[in-house]
């Protein structure tokens, strides 16, 4: 079965084609990727310091058809070769989701194909199955992105249990807001991680929120406030030397990243112990953070569990993960469509409510 996937939940337009045959034959899942196209809107939103929903929707309209053509050209396929269409149904920006839904449903109806709405987070959770070493069910998923920070137990396709989540800012959101405090460019997550590599460890004693809370929830708003307080103290010193200012920013970025990484790693290890799982999956945009990956690898080597990552290019939003998740859903549901004829979207959508019965 060849599935077309369309992702338009926020500021990336992604289109991909996935063939389920390798998965069904027990071969590495990544062998099923036939073609993909991806366009990021980062440059367009940079002047605004964040995503402008109206601009995002308009850009999705411009990009989705050329990306479909690009994916078909890569794969050597025609529209008539497609067996089903998957699209991001939610959560996300309403206007952006509507573009993908309308395009996908119109195409599916025109070609007389089934369509399936995919939960955006399910796409992220399953994307590590496309890596070189796929995890075994059940596994713990640490999902960290600009909008979500969650620990999930994944027992199979469509079998998800929330173990803990952020009570305020998501980790990716904290990265972006802190980067803005330090005067870094948008998007802030990658910028602050790069700056942290130049910083010295332990210069600032920043809090590690909820590290010893006893549960698996997170909170990062207080950490952002602590960074703000440090910047105010530094400003009051009236230091004007460029080298000193640059080192201050690097040291503060290092302490900030170290604090977030410490909390994420500790909670992940606790989730593994509580559930007895031996496999941990890191997914979402922050999953590309090299400091977090290094810390998880070190902890795994000392404590006897395995960590699995999606390919770096699949950490951010993309069409491959939607095509893949949609394909696995359709196999689990015996190729049934799960959407009506309407252009239905779910800007707010709890993943567990979409579990298979």
Swiss-Prot record:
Substrate binds at residues 143-147, 176, 189, 289. Keywords: Acyltransferase, Cytoplasm, Iron, Metal-binding, Transferase, tRNA processing. The keyword Iron applies. It is found in: Cytoplasm. Disulfide bonds: none annotated. It catalyses: L-threonylcarbamoyladenylate + adenosine(37) in tRNA = N(6)-L-threonylcarbamoyladenosine(37) in tRNA + AMP + H(+). One of its GO terms (molecular function) is N(6)-L-threonylcarbamoyladenine synthase activity. NCBIfam families: gcp_kae1 (TIGR00329), T6A_TsaD_YgjD (TIGR03723). Required for the formation of a threonylcarbamoyl group on adenosine at position 37 (t(6)A37) in tRNAs that read codons beginning with adenine. Is involved in the transfer of the threonylcarbamoyl moiety of threonylcarbamoyl-AMP (TC-AMP) to the N6 group of A37, together with TsaE and TsaB. TsaD likely plays a direct catalytic role in this reaction. This is tRNA N6-adenosine threonylcarbamoyltransferase. It comes from Polynucleobacter asymbioticus (strain DSM 18221 / CIP 109841 / QLW-P1DMWA-1).
